[in-house]
């Protein structure tokens, strides 16, 4: 069994080891590629300040590229008795290179190493989430334009209210995603600052070149203050979780709408048959299980910031092992959200709308405000027009031609989808993922 990086003469109690390591071996597999990339940047910097020779650097880089390839193939494991990915990588280098492998940790702590790994992992995941959100956005805008002239009932308090349109419905969720992406961009900017060199949280007596590792890893800038770099652990995950939760909130609401509007009592939309499931007892059933599960998963994601907040709450400055537990709820969350986005994008692209829903007589009164506004435009005071239409409804005399005349920005007749698309493009352009992608390729020599 491998010796711990910190182990000296006293052996660790096995129950204590099991408890303290917890699920870290499992969780750290998410971080393995990023740990290798961080080490490649770190040793390149170490060679520049004379702590490694050029030959040692070349040996270490070659072995790290081999380890990186094994991660990509899904062959990398963290051995029993090894605490984490950092220890596993150093162990593999030491086995292959002897004393040269032992030099890799100079000027570094697992505290700044894991924080770096988390930032590298998270910014990659944010890029994938942003791409998935953008795909869903374009589908929603496409459907909004396709059905912009098809009316549907609008509800308040779950009561029939005013005319809406499928163009408005699809477009509303598209614009919601624009705001969500702004949250995600703020999280990305916080994530894209280099903590490496903060070591255990108080810096190092080695003359580290933190600007160099910042450039090598494609970060926008540094976490300058080494104490704050470590204080940012927990805060980083919480703020990213808020961004994920914001997107999840939009998807959850859309899923609820789709389930409700697909039901026989509404009949506004029809989900694709291949996206529904059946019943073991009722042969007629076509259940919207995909959106029900999406709703539940997204509601779970909306609890993530609170979970992280409670784990990291009331900690003073400095590193604490409490922070390890955040990985268990944080790292898997990205894939859950990506799955929900993928399912939602597919179904929204295939969904069918009922173009004749307002032919049902129960929706006649939905046009009452249209009639009030018509009378007001003809000169009747609004309140008098309101009362007249109300009395006509009570007397059973209300009629309307079921036409709407909305022209202002963002209304049925003027969706402003071009303006909404321009807003989304502005946010997308603001991410600037190119720097991180180019830096990672350069480190790997690709």
Curated annotation (Swiss-Prot):
Annotated pathway: Amino-acid biosynthesis; L-arginine biosynthesis; L-arginine from L-ornithine and carbamoyl phosphate: step 3/3
Kindly indicate whether the keyword Amino-acid biosynthesis belongs to this entry: yes
According to its UniProt entry, the protein's GO biological process terms are: arginine biosynthetic process via ornithine; L-arginine biosynthetic process
| GO MF annotations, alphabetized | argininosuccinate lyase activity
Q: Which domain of life is it from?
A: Bacteria
Q: Where in the cell is it found?
A: Cytoplasm
**Which reactions fall under this protein's catalytic activity?**
2-(N(omega)-L-arginino)succinate = fumarate + L-arginine
Q: Which enzyme class?
A: lyase
Q: For this UniProt entry, what's an example GO CC term?
A: cytosol
Q: Which PROSITE patterns match?
A: FUMARATE_LYASES (PS00163)
Q: Which Gene3D superfamilies match?
A: Fumarase/aspartase (C-terminal domain) (1.10.40.30), Fumarase/aspartase (Central domain) (1.20.200.10), Fumarase/aspartase (N-terminal domain) (1.10.275.10)
Predominant subcellular localization, coarse grouping: cytoplasm
What keywords does the record list, in alphabetical order?
Amino-acid biosynthesis, Arginine biosynthesis, Cytoplasm, Lyase
EC number(s) given by UniProt? 4.3.2.1
CDD domains under this entry?
Argininosuccinate_lyase
Could you tell me which NCBIfam families the record lists for this protein?
A: argH
Task: Cite the HAMAP family for this sequence.
Answer: Arg_succ_lyase
Q: What PANTHER family does the record tag this protein with? A: ARGININOSUCCINATE LYASE
Q: Family membership, please give it.
A: Belongs to the lyase 1 family. Argininosuccinate lyase subfamily.
Name-wise, this protein is Argininosuccinate lyase
């Amino acid at each position: 069994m491998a010796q711990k990086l910190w182990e000296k003469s006293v052996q660790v109690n096995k129950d204590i080891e099991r408890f303290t390591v917890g699920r870290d071996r499992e969780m750290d597999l998410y971080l393995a590629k990023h740990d290798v990339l961080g080490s490649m940047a770190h040793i390149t910097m170490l060679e520049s300040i004379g702590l490694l020779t050029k030959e040692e650097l070349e040996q270490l880089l070659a072995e790290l590229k081999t380890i990186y390839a094994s991660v990509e193939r899904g062959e990398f494991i963290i051995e029993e008795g090894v605490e984490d990915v950092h220890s596993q990588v150093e162990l593999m280098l030491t086995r292959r290179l002897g004393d040269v492998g032992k030099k890799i940790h100079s000027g570094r702590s697992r505290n700044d190493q894991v924080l770096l790994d988390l930032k590298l992992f998270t910014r990659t995941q944010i890029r994938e989430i942003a791409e998935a959100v953008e795909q869903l956005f374009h589908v929603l805008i496409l459907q909004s334009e396709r059905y912009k002239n098809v009316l549907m009932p609008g509800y308040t308090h779950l009561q029939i209210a005013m005319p809406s349109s499928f163009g408005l419905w699809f477009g509303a969720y598209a614009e919601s995603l624009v705001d969500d992406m702004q949250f995600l961009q703020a999280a990305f900017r916080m994530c894209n600052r280099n903590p490496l060199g903060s070591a255990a949280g108080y810096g190092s007596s080695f003359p580290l070149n933190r600007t160099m590792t910042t450039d090598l890893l494609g970060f926008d800038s540094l976490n300058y203050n080494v104490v704050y770099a470590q204080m940012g652990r927990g805060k980083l995950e919480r703020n990213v979780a808020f961004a994920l939760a914001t997107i999840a909130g939009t998807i959850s609401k859309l899923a609820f709408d789709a389930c409700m509007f697909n039901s026989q009592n509404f009949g506004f939309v029809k989900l694709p048959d291949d996206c529904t499931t059946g019943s073991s007892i009722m042969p007629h059933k076509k259940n919207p299980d995909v959106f029900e599960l999406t709703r539940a998963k997204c509601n779970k994601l909306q609890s993530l910031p609170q979970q992280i907040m409670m784990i990291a709450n009331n900690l003073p400055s400095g590193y604490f092992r409490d922070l390890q537990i955040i990985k268990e709820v944080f790292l898997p969350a990205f894939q859950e959200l990506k799955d929900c986005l993928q399912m939602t994008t597919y179904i929204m692209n295939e969904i069918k709308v009922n173009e004749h829903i307002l032919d049902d007589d129960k929706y006649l009164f939905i046009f009452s405000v249209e009639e009030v506004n018509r009378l007001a435009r003809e000169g009747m005071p609004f309140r008098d027009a309101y009362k007249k239409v109300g009395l006509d409804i009570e007397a059973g005399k209300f009629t309307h031609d079921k036409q709407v005349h909305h022209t202002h920005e963002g209304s049925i007749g003027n969706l402003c989808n071009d303006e909404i698309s321009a807003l989304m493009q502005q946010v997308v352009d603001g991410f600037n993922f190119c720097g991180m992608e180019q830096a990672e390729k350069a480190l790997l020599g690709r």
